[in-house]
């Protein structure tokens, strides 16, 4: 009986300590915050150098969903921008024949002043976030007139 009592007391004290120790070990290995730079660029994917427009800065973040087969008309941007593909795939091209393909988890710097298009390719809609550093009142996308 005495052995059983000692065993029960030892187990009653040791098991919670083991459980607490395990939790502390697990939480100590998890970073409270992880910062990962997805893209840093001084020029766009097609080689455009960036120039910030003059005026009152206006930052914009767009969430774009493009159904399979959707293709933008030819256009250009007057401001620097970056894009992040969440799902689906994009194929983009310029008038001078430069091309880009981007899929889930990929980022790219958008062209500035170069006429281009982008198309949602594949069987699922493309979900893309685009951040732009423009000027208040300025259009983010300017249609190309031939």
Residue ranges of model-derived segments:
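Sec-dependent signal peptide recognition
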Residues: 2-10
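A short, N-terminal "cap"/entry segment at the start of jelly-roll beta-barrel domains
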Residues: 4-5, 17-60, 109, 143-146
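Hydrophobic core
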Residues: 9, 13-17
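A short beta-loop-beta micro-motif enriched in histidine and acidic residues
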Residues: 53-57, 69-82
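Short acidic-glycine-tyrosine-enriched beta hairpin
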Residues: 66, 96-113
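Histidine-centered metal-chelating micro-motifs
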Residues: 71-73, 91, 106-108, 112-119
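Glycine- and acidic-residue-biased ligand/ion/polar-headgroup-sensing regions
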Residues: 77-96
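Ligand-binding loop in jelly-roll beta-barrel domains
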Residues: 112-139
